[in-house]
Swiss-Prot record:
Cofactor field: Mg(2+)
Protein name: ATP phosphoribosyltransferase
Activity regulation, short description: Feedback inhibited by histidine.
Lineage: Archaea, Thermoproteota, Thermoprotei, Thermoproteales, Thermoproteaceae
Species whose genome carries this gene: Pyrobaculum islandicum (strain DSM 4184 / JCM 9189 / GEO3)
Family: Belongs to the ATP phosphoribosyltransferase family. Long subfamily.
Annotated GO biological process: L-histidine biosynthetic process
Length: 282
C-alpha cells in the first residue's frame, strides 16, 4: 500500500526521520524515484508535494499520508487525521508591515490585499469576520510582497517569527495552529496496516525521554530499593539462579536518572545498567 510523504519543504526531513525511527526505511537510493519500496514489505512510499497529499489520500488510491494540518484544512479533503505527529509546528497568521501601524485584525482596512497560498482558508477566515478583502493568490515568497507593493498583508505559516521579522512584518492575528499529521482515507481507518503504523509511531514517541534500568539487589535490600524505584506499573523482579540476589528492571524517566541511580546505589543496588528504548508499546 502507498504512504504519501512530503517531497520537499519543512516537513520532509522530520518525516523521513520518523519513518526510519519506526522501522520504515526506503530501500531505493535514487532521489529521483517517486515511488520507493521500504523495509516494511506491505508499505511503499510515494513522494508528493505536501499540499497535494490530502487530495491523493482523498482519492482512495493512496492509503495514508503525512502532511501539515494547514494543507489538510486548505484542501477540504475527506480524510481522517489519525495522529498529531508533533513536528512541523507553527501558526497560520495574518501579518502586516510594522510601518503600517496596524495592531489588530480589526484595523485591517476594507479592500486590503492579502497575499497567501492558503486561499480557501483566507476566504473562510475573512468571511467569518465579515471583512471584505482582496485575496492575492501566490505560490511562494509571500513575505516579500508587501515590500513590493503587491499586498497590504499576508496570511502564511509562522514557525519562529524570524522570517517575518527579516521582512519587517508583524503578526496581528492567528488563524489556526498547525503541525504534521498522519492522515488516512476513511475506508482505511480500521485497516490492520493503519493500526500497525499508529502502534509503532505511538511506541516511538512513548519511548522518548525514558530509559530502561537494570540492577541486581541482595534480598536484604530489595524492599528498600523497590520503595525508591519508579515504574510504569510495577518494577519487574526475578530471582537469580545463584545466591540470594534479585534482578530488578524498570522503565524510568530519563531526567531523574542521575539522582535515581545514586539513591539506588546507596540503598544497596549494584551492577546497575541503563539502556535506551527504541519503542514502548502498551
Amino acid at each position: 500500500m502507498l504512504l504519501a510523504i512530503p517531497s520537499k519543504g519543512r516537513l520532509q526531513e522530520p518525516t523521513l526521520r520518523l519513518l526510519e525511527a519506526v522501522g520504515i526505511k526506503p530501500l531505493a537510493s535514487d532521489e529521483r524515484a517517486l515511488v520507493l519500496p521500504t523495509s516494511w514489505n506491505d508499505v511503499n512510499i510515494i513522494k508528493a508535494r505536501p499540499e497535494d497529499i490530502p487530495y491523493l489520500v482523498d482519492s482512495g488510491r493512496i492509503w495514508a499520508g503525512i502532511t501539515g494540518h494547514d494543507y489538510i484544512i486548505e484542501s477540504g479533503s475527506n480524510v481522517v487525521e489519525v495522529l498529531d505527529l508533533e513536528f512541523g509546528k507553527g501558526k497560520l497568521v495574518v501579518a502586516v508591515p510594522k510601518t503600517s501601524g496596524i495592531k489588530s485584525i480589526d484595523e485591517l482596512p476594507p479592500g486590503a490585499r492579502v497575499a497567501t497560498k492558503f486561499v480557501n482558508i483566507a476566504y473562510n477566515y475573512f468571511a467569518e469576520l465579515g471583512k471584505r478583502v482582496r485575496i492575492v493568490r501566490v505560490a511562494g515568497s509571500v513575505e516579500i510582497l508587501p515590500q513590493l507593493g503587491i499586498a497590504d498583508a499576508i496570511l502564511d505559516v509562522m514557525a519562529t517569527g524570524t522570517t517575518l521579522e527579516i521582512h519587517g512584518l508583524t503578526p496581528i492575528a492567528t488563524v489556526l495552529e498547525t503541525s504534521a499529521r498522519l492522515i488516512v482515507h476513511p475506508n482505511y481507518v480500521n485497516h490492520e496496516l493503519t493500526k500497525k503504523l499508529v502502534t509503532f509511531i505511538k511506541g516511538y514517541y512513548a519511548a522518548q525521554g525514558r530509559k530502561m534500568i537494570f540492577l541486581n539487589v541482595p534480598a536484604t535490600k530489595l524492599e528498600d530499593v523497590l520503595s525508591i524505584l519508579p515504574a510504569m506499573e510495577a518494577p519487574s523482579v526475578t530471582k537469580l539462579a545463584k545466591g540470594d540476589v534479585y534482578e530488578v528492571f524498570s522503565v524510568v524517566p530519563e531526567d531523574i536518572l542521575p539522582d535515581l541511580v545514586m539513591k539506588l546505589k546507596n540503598a544497596g543496588a549494584k551492577d546497575i545498567v541503563v539502556t535506551s528504548i527504541e519503542k514502548l508499546i502498551s
